[in-house]
């Protein structure tokens, strides 16, 4: 009986630890009718403007993102661990000829997404843009802690394409 109790407690502990990654406190997709303000963001080659964001806890923000750089860039709301876990997906997209330096092969992306959903890059916390493209994200910063906005295109995060998010 004691061994069974230890096994159950150990399983519960490890399951809650493992599932914590999937439920990291970064907020959630927001609704347009709840937007409190709009922040315009420009993505240059390996930096964002603005370079940091001050956001009130619980606030819903509409990010209007424009890639003014010469390379493909990503605007991704997550914490450091989530960015690191997302980077192999982005590398796989590059290895499969989907993610190129100056463009995204959307036809290949659609085909790959049928086999591997992560290759569709349809995350609600992220937008992947070619040069001169615009996109938007509506995000609710509820229970959000340790957030950073980063580009996970191979090499860009490592080059410092990260913006700090201060939750007040």
Language-model segments: which ranges?
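Sec-dependent N-terminal signal peptides
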Residues: 4-13
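Extracellular/luminal beta-rich ligand-recognition
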Residues: 88-112
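Asparagine-centered strand-capping/turn motif at beta-strand->loop junctions
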Residues: 65-69
């Amino acid at each position: 009986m004691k061994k069974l109790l230890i096994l159950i407690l150990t399983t519960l502990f490890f399951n809650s630890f493992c599932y914590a990654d999937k439920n990291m406190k970064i907020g959630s997709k927001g609704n347009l009718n709840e937007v409190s303000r709009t922040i315009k963001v420009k993505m240059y080659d390996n930096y964002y403007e603005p370079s940091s964001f001050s956001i009130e806890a619980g606030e819903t923000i509409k990010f209007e993102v424009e890639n003014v750089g010469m390379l493909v860039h990503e605007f991704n709301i997550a914490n450091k661990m989530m960015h690191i876990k997302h980077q192999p997906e982005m590398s796989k997209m590059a290895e499969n000829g989907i993610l190129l330096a100056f463009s995204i092969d959307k036809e290949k992306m659609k085909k790959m997404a049928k086999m591997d959903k992560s290759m569709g890059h349809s995350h609600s916390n992220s937008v992947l843009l070619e040069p001169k493209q615009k996109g938007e994200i509506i995000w609710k910063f509820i229970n959000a802690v340790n957030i950073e906005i980063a580009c996970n295109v191979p090499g860009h995060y490592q080059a410092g394409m990260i913006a700090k998010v201060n939750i007040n």
